[in-house]
């Protein structure tokens, strides 16, 4: 399994752009064109004050077990920045664009990117 942590909006998270994400991936599929897998972006809940850990990695591992490349988005919360519209939604839009832009490196089918969200995370989807 591959695990990588990244800043969403640049090299390092900043006060203005605190969002991060974790890529949890598997090796390319030998029986698929270019070894590409579908991708899922996971947005945990937490009332926009935090992100509940039990709605992140366990969900990612379940999707990995079903053949997906998983991305756990740590969107902006009130403890990290401004949660007013459109900041969390902009984080998700950037995440979708980032997954598609890095499809070759992460062995993702850019036409098969989905999003799952829980509670506050579902509100930004």
Regions found by a protein language model. Give the residues of each.
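Gly/Ser-rich "nucleophile elbow"/oxyanion-hole loop immediately N-terminal to the catalytic nucleophile
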Residues: 86, 97-119
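Core alpha-helical elements of the protein kinase catalytic domain
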Residues: 61, 93, 97-100
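Cap/lid segment of the alpha/beta-hydrolase catalytic domain
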Residues: 47-55, 72-87
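Hydrolases whose catalytic domains are alpha/beta-hydrolase-1, hotdog thioesterase
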Residues: 124-125
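Loop/turn elements at helix/coil->beta-strand transitions in domains of secreted/extracellular proteins
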Residues: 37-38, 66-68, 110-112
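Short amphipathic alpha-helix adjacent to the substrate-entry channel of hydrolases
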Residues: 53-71
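Short beta-strand element of the alpha/beta-hydrolase
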Residues: 36-45
């Amino acid at each position: 399994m591959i695990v990588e942590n990244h800043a969403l909006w640049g090299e390092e998270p900043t006060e203005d752009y605190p969002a991060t994400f974790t890529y949890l991936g598997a090796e390319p599929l030998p029986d698929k064109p270019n070894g590409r897998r579908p991708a899922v972006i996971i947005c945990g809940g937490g009332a926009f004050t935090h992100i509940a850990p039990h709605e992140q990695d366990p969900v990612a591992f379940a999707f990995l077990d079903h053949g997906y490349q998983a991305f756990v988005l740590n969107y902006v919360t009130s403890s990290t920045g401004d949660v007013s519209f459109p900041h969390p939604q902009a984080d998700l839009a950037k995440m979708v664009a980032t997954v598609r832009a890095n499809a070759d490196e992460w062995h993702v089918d850019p036409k098969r990117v989905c999003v799952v969200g829980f509670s506050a995370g579902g509100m930004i989807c």
